[in-house]
Amino acid sequence: MSEENQVAATEAEEQTPFELQIQRIYIKDVSFEAPNLPTIFHQEWKPQLGFELDTETVKLADDLYEVILHINVSTTLEDSGDTAFICEVKQAGVFTIKGLEGIQLAHCLASQCPSVLYPYARELIASLVNRGTFPALNLSPVNFDALFVDYLQRQEQEAAEAEEETPAPASN
């Protein structure tokens, strides 16, 4: 066996195998409001899109987690400021995750599970907007890995700032 193959085999052995299984994917909550229909259709369509995304995790049992993806999309018209529509979706899933702990488990729950749920939520939002007879809304993909890294960096920064603000003990 060559040295490269031995190194690759050693690295593969060191990596902990893990299991991620989708148990169920479902809509936990959905709301679509178009408060200014039908008068909004008589205005020039220059939309301003608002997009908010968040995740929530609930541990249901050992190795069993519910992940909820919260997405709020709102559109107002640029000229009048009138709200065209507000769409709120909570797309959820139950996942079995084995073989991960600590930061690796947190990464899976904050990145891999939402990546599974997002296409379902995106399709639901597009369908609701279409049923409201608005122009098609195609939401861009989301890089949940990058969002997780940003979250970790913010946590580190907040911890460092909190440490700086803590007064030093008085010496006698």
Swiss-Prot record:
Ranked from the top, the taxonomy reads: Bacteria, Pseudomonadati, Pseudomonadota, Gammaproteobacteria, Pasteurellales
Q: Does the keyword Transport apply?
A: yes
Q: Which InterPro entries does UniProt cross-reference here?
A: SecB, SecB-like_sf
Q: Which HAMAP family match?
A: SecB (MF_00821)
- Secretion signal span: none
Its annotated function is as follows: One of the proteins required for the normal export of preproteins out of the cell cytoplasm. It is a molecular chaperone that binds to a subset of precursor proteins, maintaining them in a translocation-competent state. It also specifically binds to its receptor SecA.
SUPFAM superfamilies, A to Z:
SecB-like (SSF54611)
Q: Which UniProt keywords apply?
A: Chaperone, Cytoplasm, Protein transport, Translocation, Transport
Instruction: Tell whether Cytoplasm is among the UniProt keywords.
Output: yes
Q: Which GO terms describe its cellular component?
A: cytoplasm
Q: How does it assemble?
A: Homotetramer, a dimer of dimers. One homotetramer interacts with 1 SecA dimer.
- What CDD domains does UniProt report for this protein, alphabetically? Translocase_SecB
- Gene name of the encoded protein: secB
Q: Name one GO molecular function term.
A: unfolded protein binding
- Which processes are annotated in GO (biological process)? protein folding; protein tetramerization; protein transport
Q: What is this protein called?
A: Protein-export protein SecB
List the transmembrane segments.
Answer: none
Q: Where in the cell is it found?
A: Cytoplasm
What family does this chain come from, according to its entry? Belongs to the SecB family.
